[in-house]
């Protein structure tokens, strides 16, 4: 019995040591999780990569200037299970993106929430639940 306890305790302790850094990676502290922001613009690039797919969007600002936004979604593995691939969004696509904006005021959104989505200009959801 003693021979089995020590290895199990060692494994358990090791898991405790890595649990903090793993949860920190998925922390939401950089984003305003209380409010949703809607962004309408033109896709300039879609990176279907891990750990998070990225959508680059040019948005016309209130003052007529172009704002370069980045929307971070789930992993490409997760999106693939939802039927999406690297060709789901293309440069020039007009999109409406809903997500949690970066707290520091940067043009960034976090899309890993069920109520977040990416829709075309007619509000047809292109990418939704899997964000």
Model segments located where?
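OB-fold/S1-family single-stranded nucleic acid-binding modules
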Residues: 102-130
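Short boundary/loop segments of OB/S1/cold-shock single-stranded nucleic-acid-binding domains
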Residues: 23-37
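Short aromatic-glycine-enriched beta-strand elements
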Residues: 49-59
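Bacterial N-terminal signal peptides that target proteins for export
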Residues: 1-9
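Cleavable N-terminal signal peptides
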Residues: 11-12, 22
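Short nucleic-acid-contacting surface segments enriched for D/E, G, S/T with interspersed K/R
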Residues: 81-97
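Conserved hydrophobic positions within beta-strands
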Residues: 41-43
């Amino acid at each position: 019995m003693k021979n089995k306890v020590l290895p199990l305790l060692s494994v358990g302790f090791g898991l405790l040591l890595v649990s903090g850094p793993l949860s920190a990676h998925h922390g939401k502290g950089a984003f305003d999780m209380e409010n949703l922001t809607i962004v309408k613009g033109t896709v300039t690039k879609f990176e279907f990569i891990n750990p998070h797919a990225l959508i680059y969007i040019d948005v016309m600002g209130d003052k007529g200037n172009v704002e370069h936004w980045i929307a971070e979604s789930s992993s490409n593995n997760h999106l693939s299970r939802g039927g999406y691939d690297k060709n789901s969004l293309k440069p020039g696509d007009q999109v409406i993106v809903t997500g949690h904006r970066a707290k520091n005021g940067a043009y960034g959104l976090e899309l890993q929430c069920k109520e977040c989505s990416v829709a075309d200009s007619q509000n047809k959801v292109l990418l939704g639940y899997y964000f």
